[in-house]
UniProtKB/Swiss-Prot annotation:
GO terms for biological process: L-tryptophan biosynthetic process. It is an enzyme of class 5 (isomerase). It catalyses: N-(5-phospho-beta-D-ribosyl)anthranilate = 1-(2-carboxyphenylamino)-1-deoxy-D-ribulose 5-phosphate. Its EC number is 5.3.1.24. This is N-(5'-phosphoribosyl)anthranilate isomerase. Pfam families: PRAI (PF00697). It comes from Lacticaseibacillus casei (Lactobacillus casei). CDD domains: PRAI.
Length: 199
């Protein structure tokens, strides 16, 4: 069954929604943008999060030392890396105990990446859905992000067969997380699907 990450969590109501709906991963954005949270905010939200939900920190070209400081403070379990990341940096994070997601925005997936998960994303919270039929089936753990909503996630899972799906703005109403949309998204993503090879 596909895993679900709800990203861009900022408020206690967001945490309640993901706890209730049964998300697998919760995303805190440390990179600049409208969903950005501070370390203090992330720690406070983490206290409210169900213990079975793993936390992901979203970073853009952040120095390894800064990421490790946030991890060592207890705010995150996984680092999601946008921008340029070297194999040495990824390995350094992993050796410290972090799982690593490397993000590929509108570019070919690097199957030689050292990361634990490879993410394909339409880029920078654009809300644009990728050409799902162009995404190759790979043996590595794959995360699908960008433009997903409760209305299209089931088809996306069927077409791409990812390990995980990731959503932020697709479960928002007027710029705020919508508990009903979060529940619908997770239900649709995790609904029993018979995978078929779709040409």
């Amino acid at each position: 069954m596909v895993l679900v990450k709800i990203c861009g969590l900022m408020h206690s109501e967001d945490i309640l929604a993901v706890n209730t709906a049964g998300a697998d991963f919760a995303g805190f954005v440390f990179a600049p943008g409208r969903h950005q949270v501070s370390l203090e905010q992330a720690l406070a939200l983490n206290q409210l999060l169900h213990s079975k939900i793993k936390t992901v920190g979203v970073f853009v070209n952040e120095p390894v030392a800064e990421i490790l400081a946030i991890y060592q403070a207890g705010a995150i379990d996984v680092a999601q890396l946008h921008g340029k990341s070297t194999p040495a940096e990824i390995t350094q994070l992993q050796q410290a105990g972090l799982k690593v997601i490397q993000v590929f925005e509108r570019q070919a997936i690097d199957l030689t990446s050292m990361a634990d998960y490879l993410m394909v994303d339409s880029g920078k919270g654009s809300g644009q859905l990728l050409n799902l039929k162009a995404i190759p089936h790979i043996s590595r753990p794959l995360i699908l992000a960008g433009g997903l909503t409760p209305l299209n996630v089931r088809q996306a899972v069927q077409l791409v067969q990812p390990t995980m799906v990731d959503v932020s703005s697709g479960v928002e109403t007027n710029g705020h997380k919508d508990a009903d949309k979060i529940t619908q998204f997770i239900q649709q993503a995790k609904e029993d699907i018979i995978y078929e090879d779709i040409k």
